[in-house]
């Protein structure tokens, strides 16, 4: 097991993968949208692909992140359309009427709203992004009972680490969960400031710091 892949499983991967496998319980043939294609969102997306969801729709503010998601198995992509309503409408169009599960991985209020609005009858929005304390979620209340929509919160992918770390790594070894492709940059520990800048810029997927003697010299 490569150390850089194993390092990812401790947080971002477990959060994203668990939201799909544990919180939502996505099954083959379910329609899934993932809103926010950073490390957590892409982990969720790969997990949905691994269980046979179809379509799996990637949604992000930037075309480059949507393209990265397609390279990891997304069957379609939507670039943020300027509002929650417009973005959700695009997802509903691509999915043929809405998704069974919309996984929200940004923590932004509008993205959460888009997740709810993207779901079909009896669909669920799974909120894994952590919002600011003052963030409020506004959705058409009537659609919750009328459409039997659900809103599910997920912290750390509803995971039990002693079980789920091993499951995730087993699926990685099988080739169905290409976690190594999340590592976009590998830097020595001495370049930690550059690593932080890369993450803040949005250019990186996941940056792994090498703490070995060779990596810090």
Per-segment meaning from a language model:
Residues 45, 66, 112-116, 141, ...:
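Generic hydrophobic/aromatic pocket-lining and core-packing "Φ" positions
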Residues 123-124, 149:
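Glycine-centered, small-residue-biased loops immediately flanking beta-strands
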Residues 113-117, 162-217:
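C-terminal hydrophobic helical "lid"/dimerization subdomain
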Residues 92, 96, 133-185, 193-194:
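C-terminal substrate-binding/catalytic core of Rossmann-like NAD(P)-dependent dehydrogenases/reductases
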Residues 34-37, 49-114:
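Adenosine-nucleotide cofactor-binding segment
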Residues 128-129:
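Acidic carboxylate diad motif detector
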Residues 1-31, 35:
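NAD(P)H dinucleotide-binding glycine-rich loop of Rossmann-like/cofactor-binding domains
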Residues 41-42:
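N-terminal Rossmann-fold NAD(P) dinucleotide-binding loop
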């Amino acid at each position: 097991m490569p150390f850089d892949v194993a390092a990812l499983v401790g947080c971002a991967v477990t959060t994203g993968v668990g939201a799909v496998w544990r919180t939502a319980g996505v099954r083959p043939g379910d329609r899934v949208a993932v809103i926010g294609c950073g490390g957590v969102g892409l982990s969720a997306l790969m997990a949905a692909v691994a269980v046979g969801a179809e379509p799996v729709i990637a949604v992000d503010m930037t075309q480059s992140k949507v393209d990265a998601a397609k390279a990891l198995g997304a069957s379609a992509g939507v670039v943020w359309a300027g509002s929650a309503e417009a973005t959700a409408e695009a997802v509903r169009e691509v999915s043929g009427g809405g998704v069974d599960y919309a996984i929200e991985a940004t923590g932004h209020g509008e993205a959460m709203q888009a997740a709810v609005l993207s779901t079909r009858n009896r669909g669920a929005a799974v909120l894994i992004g952590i919002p600011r304390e003052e963030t409020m979620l506004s959705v058409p209340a009537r659609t919750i009972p009328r459409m039997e929509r659900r809103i599910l919160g997920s912290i750390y992918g509803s995971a039990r680490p002693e079980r789920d770390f091993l499951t995730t790594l087993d699926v990685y070894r099988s080739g169905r969960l290409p976690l190594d492709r999340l590592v976009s940059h590998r830097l020595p520990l001495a370049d930690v400031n550059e690593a932080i800048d890369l993450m803040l810029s949005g250019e990186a997927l996941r940056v792994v710091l090498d703490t070995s003697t060779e990596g810090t010299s």
